[in-house]
Amino acid sequence: MIPPADSLLKYDTPVLVSRNTEKRSPKARLLKVSPQQPGPSGSAPQLPKTKLPSAPCVPDPTKQAEEILNAILPPREWVEDTQLWIQQVSSTPSTRMDVVHLQEQLDLKLQQRQARETGICPVRRELYSQCFDELIREVTINCAERGLLLLRVRDEIRMTIAAYQTLYESSVAFGMRKALQAEQGKSDMERKIAELETEKRDLERQVNEQKAKCEATEKRESERRQVEEKKHNEEIQFLKRTNQQLKAQLEGIIAPKK
């Protein structure tokens, strides 16, 4: 495991943890002699021991603060060269200069890691989380109750951010599904449009063919009508001439009888 990166949260010096995990056997525990066990035969009986008043157990404030810090900000562990190292959060109180230095380090890291000033930025969120943890550490050393209250605030913020992140991921997944569906619908629509355009071209070709046939038919009918009209006119003229001739002949026959 790679050693943890530098953090704005102040830690103590790393400590090498002993990897001797041997456990005492049950037999070893049974070999203990009870204080009430009688001695060997012939020996004088033991007198009861006088119980001395014990001093009242006063909790060590420093140790109590360290325990609270370890509960709020757990130590970080890593393995290096098959050796387990542990690094606890520092319990050293901070001064005003430490706070000023923390602000300078925050601004420097934001600039070095090119964190975005606006919008969603994981780098900016990570650095501000480290800064907030460091502030919780500094406050907890001076007042454990205030530190625990800040811990609740931090956990609430993380829970809210996690909920928003889950909602964002769900929205992105929903948007991707809708985009894929729209893309698939677009492909189907494009295919249908291509089919309709092909059908349209076929229908236009058929319309043009029918128009050509209609024009040819109209032309033939017009020519036939003209021929028929000419023929009818010639027949009418012939019949008129015949009628005039017959009329003249009839008048010639009738006129001498008078």
Swiss-Prot record:
GO BP term, example: sperm flagellum assembly
Pfam families xrefs: Ax_dynein_light (PF10211)
Annotated GO MF terms: dynein heavy chain binding
UniProt region (Disordered), positions on chain: 19-60, 207-231
Compositional bias of kind Low complexity: 34-48
Record InterPro entries: Axonemal_dynein_light_chain (IPR019347)
Main location: other
Segments forming a coiled coil: 176-255
GO cellular component, one term: dynein complex
Annotated localization: Cell projection, Cilium; Cell projection, Cilium, Flagellum; Dynein axonemal particle; Cytoplasm
Keyword vocabulary terms for this entry: Cell projection, Cilium, Coiled coil, Cytoplasm, Dynein, Flagellum, Motor protein
Protein's UniProt keywords contain Cytoplasm: yes
Protein's job: Involved in sperm flagellum assembly.
Complex and partners: Interacts with CFAP45. Interacts with DYNC1H1.
Similarity section: Belongs to the inner dynein arm light chain family.
This protein's name: Axonemal dynein light intermediate polypeptide 1
Organism: Macaca fascicularis
